[in-house]
């Protein structure tokens, strides 16, 4: 189930990869009216696909029939422990996504103001850094899927809760990567792109473990 969801996760990140390249480039080069207009067109296309694809969804009565057959039973002590463990992990999950979403603001501002984006005399748009995360999801999801299958074959695949815990640890580690970059900017200097790329890499692996 975890591996199947990871494959699905690659699909939903397709738009996240192309949107910074298209909307960000239009916004930075031509004006943000063009960038937001392109985003609006993309949202309309997504809505059309969603409405068109509804015919492939299972009818609602399946869930209603299943709910009618369910018989509530009292929770066992083991069930209570699992629920409390889930509550704790949900709390960490909230923190994870709150910090993760810094990609769209704090890290974007860092890329714009404190990162040397010159490549052979060409300056890469700061918004393109937003495409790094989904690109890494494309690249590393198959590798992690294979790794988890390899672990499962040896009876050592972590549980879903263990994976979420690993993801939270990697989240913290990703921002530790930026400490040397911050030091290099003292006095008005700019950090190399490698630091932000490395931070995004560790953050992405953590995201895949948690998601």
Locations of regions flagged by a protein language model:
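Intracellular juxtamembrane helix-capping segments at the cytosolic ends
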Residues: 1, 5, 208-211
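Intracellular loop-helix junctions on the cytosolic face of multi-pass helical membrane proteins
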Residues: 2, 6, 23-128, 143-156
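Transmembrane alpha-helical cores of Major Facilitator Superfamily
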Residues: 6-14, 131, 135, 169, ...
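Hydrophobic/aromatic residues within the transmembrane alpha-helices of Major Facilitator Superfamily
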Residues: 14, 48, 94-98, 135, ...
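C-terminal transmembrane helical hairpin of 12-TM major facilitator-type secondary transporters
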Residues: 161-210
């Amino acid at each position: 189930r975890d591996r199947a969801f990871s494959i699905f996760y690659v699909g939903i990140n397709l738009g996240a990869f192309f949107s910074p390249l298209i909307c960000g480039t239009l916004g930075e080069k031509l004006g943000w009216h063009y960038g937001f207009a392109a985003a609006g067109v993309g949202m309309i296309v997504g809505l059309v696909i969603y409405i068109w694809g509804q015919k492939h969804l299972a009818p609602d009565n399946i869930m209603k029939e299943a709910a009618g057959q369910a018989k509530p039973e009292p929770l066992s002590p083991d069930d209570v422990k699992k629920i409390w463990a889930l509550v704790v992990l949900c709390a960490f999950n909230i923190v994870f996504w709150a910090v993760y979403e810094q990609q769209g603001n704090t890290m974007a501002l860092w890329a714009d103001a404190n990162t040397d984006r010159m490549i052979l005399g060409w300056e890469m748009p700061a918004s393109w850094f937003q495409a790094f995360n989904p690109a890494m999801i494309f690249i590393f999801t198959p590798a992690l899927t294979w790794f988890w299958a390899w672990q499962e074959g040896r009876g050592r695949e972590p549980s879903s809760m263990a994976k979420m815990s690993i993801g939270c640890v990697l989240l913290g580690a990703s921002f530790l990567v930026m400490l040397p970059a911050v030091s290099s900017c003292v006095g008005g200097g700019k950090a190399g792109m490698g630091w932000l790329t490395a931070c995004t890499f560790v953050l992405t692996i953590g995201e895949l473990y948690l998601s």
